[in-house]
């Protein structure tokens, strides 16, 4: 029998998973579908961690391979994202209560914007228990956090027009490029999931300047929260 994971961790970039991987005990690595999956133990639990790459297709490939190969009870998508709600500032944390794919649009044939055909859903709800643990961890670490809708799409949002469209159409407070695809994949497989994002940029005209400045710090905050979730879940 292969490695059965209690928790699976997915991040898009090395900065988002490197530190978590370094904490693994009894670690090993296996390549599936072109993605390196790092397995081991954290806080006595079987954990699998992967860097999926940027964008929805890479994220979905990674989540599907992880579920089929390691059967995690919970998938955690950790990393950084852009602020959609103007109240958010760099290094704030957003815990998604639901995910939406903002670039999914078949409204020309009468569907609601964001509808995923075949399963007839616009939003995917995250695991309530995992969300509560993350909120408690944020309070303990004195991190400024928000809970709300996170929007996913295959575009780095860096214009006020895109930001306003995502906010008004979906009620999203943050945006990124993987969470909605991981949520979609987890949903069709019956796997629980949670998505957390540390804000690295303002998703507007300043985004390209904010992002490299705040990325390393934001990724470290996400790592601390993810480790707390693994310990308590």
Residue ranges and their predicted role:
Residues 23, 129-144, 185, 221-232:
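Generic non-transmembrane alpha-helical segments
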Residues 65-69, 87-88, 184-192:
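Alpha-helix C-terminal capping segments
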Residues 71-76:
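Proline-aspartate-enriched helix->loop->beta-strand connector
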Residues 84-170:
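Mid-sequence, gly/pro-rich, charge-dense loop/helix-turn segments that line enzyme active sites
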């Amino acid at each position: 029998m292969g490695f059965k994971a209690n928790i699976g961790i997915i991040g898009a970039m090395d900065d988002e998973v490197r530190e978590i991987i370094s904490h693994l005990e009894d670690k090993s690595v296996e390549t599936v579908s072109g993605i390196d999956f790092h397995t081991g133990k954290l806080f006595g639990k079987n954990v699998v961690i992967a860097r999926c790459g940027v964008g929805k297709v890479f994220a979905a490939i990674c989540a599907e391979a992880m579920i089929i190969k390691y059967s995690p009870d919970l998938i955690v998508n950790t990393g950084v994202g852009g602020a959609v709600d103007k109240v958010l500032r760099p290094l704030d944390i957003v815990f998604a209560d639901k995910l939406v794919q903002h670039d999914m649009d078949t409204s020309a044939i009468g569907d609601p914007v964001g509808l995923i055909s075949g399963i007839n859903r616009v939003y995917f709800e995250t695991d309530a228990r995992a969300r509560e643990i993350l909120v408690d961890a944020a309070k303990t670490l004195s991190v400024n956090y928000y809970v709300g809708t996170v929007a996913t799409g295959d575009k780095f949002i860096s214009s006020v027009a895109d930001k306003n469209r995502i906010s008004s159409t979906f009620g999203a407070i943050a945006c990124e490029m993987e969470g909605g695809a991981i949520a979609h994949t987890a949903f069709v497989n019956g796997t629980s999931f949670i998505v957390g994002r540390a804000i690295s940029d303002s998703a507007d005209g300043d985004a390209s300047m904010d992002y490299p400045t705040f990325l390393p710090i934001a990724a470290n905050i996400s790592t601390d929260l993810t480790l707390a979730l693994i310990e308590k879940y």
